[in-house]
């Protein structure tokens, strides 16, 4: 298995270094649900500004304040602890009376707004996230500047970030132990984290191998393509390659890579043979995913940060802003810019 730090770069390995997350204010995330609260219903959506706080810890504190069980509080996604984040939480509180959530107090947290909503906020139920990052002590301004320009055109590999694999790769190691021992895992959180890490690592490996080819955006026979921003896909045939290539070049279509699991992967012929070869040695993880009935899926190989802009405060400090769809990692963007330093550069929750 290719280590995360050794995954293939789209723009080549960065020439310089820089400090990421020198302080929480250097990594700002604003959650974009893509919808507004209904204004009625048995649930309450609460938007909270948090600084240096773990998502689960805030959810538990909110449940305690509302005097409800912790399972009655949900959120759309884990947010970085070592950052300033605006995040929505959802609490099931039936009844006509609206609790005074402005009275909720927790160090590092501030309630920004709240309103009733008809449906529970489920994991993954968000449109995306807006990021504002500050990179400090940049050693090669010219290299970073050119990379930002290139990313606007060519994007970055849509790798799952190092956070997905746990501190020191602990989630992936757990998945490997589970695969090797076949011992039942009762803890639902561990099951979820380990299976997710296994599938993410296989996806990253497929993308890394594809990037070693001459042109990662070259459509091959049997590729699974999806409309940009959509989840469904279709298979490319030899007769269509020229037209499909034009649509890929126009960013209308995205070439996908497999999220391996049970069932068909989605590719055929040349593309399927390539994907299978890319992870042929990772039989234990593949067997685990099939055994645990994790369905195979697809994910775009490349990621195009939207609304990308930047401002150099001086020759060694740059502020970068962009928006990413749900499930994408800001650290996978930064990885193509600089070799990051800093205690929390790769750490999330």
From Swiss-Prot:
Keywords: Isomerase, tRNA processing
Pfam family, one: TruD
Record-linked PROSITE patterns: TRUD, UPF0024
Domain TRUD: 155-303
GO CC, any one term: cytosol
An example Gene Ontology molecular-function term: RNA binding
Catalytic residues in the record: 80 (nucleophile)
InterPro entries: PsdUridine_synth_cat_dom_sf, PsdUridine_synth_TruD, PsdUridine_synth_TruD_CS, PsdUridine_synth_TruD_insert, TruD_catalytic, TruD_insert_sf, TruD_pseudoU_synthase
Database matches in SUPFAM superfamilies: Pseudouridine synthase
Primary role: Responsible for synthesis of pseudouridine from uracil-13 in transfer RNAs.
Family: Belongs to the pseudouridine synthase TruD family.
Name listed for the protein in its UniProt record: tRNA pseudouridine synthase D
């Amino acid at each position: 298995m290719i280590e995360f730090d050794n995954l293939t770069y789209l723009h080549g390995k960065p020439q310089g270094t820089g400090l990421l997350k020198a302080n929480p204010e250097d990594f700002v995330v604003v959650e974009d649900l893509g919808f507004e609260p209904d204004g009625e219903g048995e649930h309450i959506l609460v938007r909270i500004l948090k600084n240096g706080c773990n998502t689960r810890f805030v959810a538990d504190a909110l449940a305690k304040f509302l005097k409800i069980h912790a399972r009655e509080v949900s959120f759309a996604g884990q947010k970085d602890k070592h950052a300033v984040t605006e995040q929505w939480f959802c609490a099931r509180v039936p009844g006509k009376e609206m609790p005074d959530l402005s009275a909720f107090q927790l160090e590092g947290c501030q309630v920004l707004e709240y309103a009733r909503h008809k449906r529970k906020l489920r994991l993954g139920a968000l449109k995306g996230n807006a990021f504002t990052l500050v990179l400090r002590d940049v050693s090669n301004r010219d290299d970073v500047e050119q990379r930002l320009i290139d990313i606007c055109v060519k994007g970055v590999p849509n790798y799952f970030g190092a956070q997905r694999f746990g501190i020191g790769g602990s989630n992936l190691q757990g998945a490997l132990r589970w695969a090797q021992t076949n011992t039942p895992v009762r803890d639902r959180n561990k099951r979820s984290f380990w299976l997710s890490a296994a599938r993410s690592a296989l996806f990253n490996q497929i993308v890394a191998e594809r990037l070693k080819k001459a042109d990662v955006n070259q459509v091959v026979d049997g590729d699974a393509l999806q409309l940009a921003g959509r989840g469904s896909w279709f298979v490319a045939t030899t007769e269509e390659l020229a037209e499909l290539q034009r649509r890929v070049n126009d960013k209308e279509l995205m070439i996908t890579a497999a999220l391996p699991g049970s069932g068909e992967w989605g590719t055929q012929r040349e593309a399927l043979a390539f994907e299978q070869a890319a992870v042929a040695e990772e039989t234990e993880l593949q067997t685990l995913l099939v055994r645990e009935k994790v369905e195979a899926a697809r994910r775009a190989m490349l990621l195009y940060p939207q609304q990308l802009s930047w401002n150099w405060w001086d020759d060694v400090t740059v502020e970068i802003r962009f928006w990413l769809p749900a499930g994408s990692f800001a650290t996978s963007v930064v990885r193509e810019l600089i070799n990051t330093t800093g205690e929390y550069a790769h750490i999330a929750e």
